[in-house]
């Protein structure tokens, strides 16, 4: 559902914050 999409986007943002050295695909 929409909530799943929102949580997915938030998860990606958190990963980007925790792993800033990871190159964006």
Swiss-Prot record:
Subcellular location as annotated: Secreted
InterPro entries xrefs: Frog_Litoria
Please tell me whether the keyword Lyase is annotated for this protein. Answer: no
Range of residues in the leader sequence:
none
GO BP field: defense response
Q: Can you quote a single GO CC term? A: extracellular region
The tissues in which it is expressed are: Expressed by the skin dorsal glands.
Question: Is Transcription found in the keyword set?
Answer: no
Give a Pfam family name. Answer: Antimicrobial24
What's in the keyword line of the UniProt record?
Amphibian defense peptide, Secreted
What family classification does the UniProt entry report for this protein? Answer: Belongs to the frog skin active peptide (FSAP) family. Aurein subfamily.
The protein's name is Aurein-5.1
Q: Which organism is it from?
A: Ranoidea raniformis (Southern bell frog)
């Amino acid at each position: 559902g929409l909530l799943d999409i929102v949580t997915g986007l938030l998860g990606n943002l958190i990963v980007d914050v925790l792993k800033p050295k990871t190159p964006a695909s």
